[in-house]
A protein has these predicted regions:
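Active-site-adjacent beta->alpha loops and helix N-cap segments on the catalytic face
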Residues: 1-18, 31-36, 53-73, 89-93, ...
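Generic alpha-helical hydrophobic packing signal
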Residues: 13, 43, 70, 75-76, ...
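Short beta-strand/loop segments at the ligand-binding rim of alpha/beta enzyme cores
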Residues: 16-29, 74-83
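Flexible, glycine/proline-enriched loop segments at strand-loop-helix junctions
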Residues: 22-23, 59, 106
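Catalytic cores of alpha/beta
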Residues: 30-41, 82, 86-105
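Non-cysteine beta-strand/loop elements that form the S-adenosyl-L-methionine
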Residues: 43-50
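Extended, intrinsically disordered, low-complexity segments
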Residues: 122-128
Length: 128
């Protein structure tokens, strides 16, 4: 539900009518959400919320060689944007190889505290 109890389907139809030339990206958490966004006609399908919602906690986008992304790519007509936990060059390369239109690298390059934590976590495990 959206504000005022409106369903996504109805909300998106209204917005699409009001802004017919605007590109719309769906930030999704599950394969089901991505398939639904594709059916609704979102221009871009994002994996942005995988692992970040109550229903997907503990899910990692890279599991089983990016099974979520592979499942979506086989079943949608709109471009898929890999976003969320794409935090290494190897992951970015792999999602492009699988067929994603683009990849978004967020926190791992834009938040110094995240970058620093990755280094300190690795270094605190070093035995002297």
């Amino acid at each position: 539900l959206r504000p005022n109890g409106e369903f996504l389907d109805d909300f998106f139809k209204e917005v699409r009518l009001k802004y017919p030339d605007q590109l719309f990206m769906a930030d999704c958490a599950s394969v089901q959400e991505m398939l639904h966004a594709d059916e609704l006609g979102f221009d871009l399908i994002g994996t942005t919320l995988v692992g970040y919602t109550d229903d997907t906690t503990g899910t990692h986008i890279e599991e089983d060689d990016f099974a979520i992304i592979r499942a979506v790519l086989k079943n949608v007509t709109h471009p898929v944007i890999a976003e969320g936990n794409i935090d290494t060059p190897a992951k970015a390369k792999r999602v492009i190889e699988l067929g994603c239109f683009s990849v978004v690298i967020g926190s791992s390059i834009t938040r110094p505290q995240v970058i620093t934590k990755r280094f300190t976590d690795a270094l605190t495990k070093v035995e002297k």
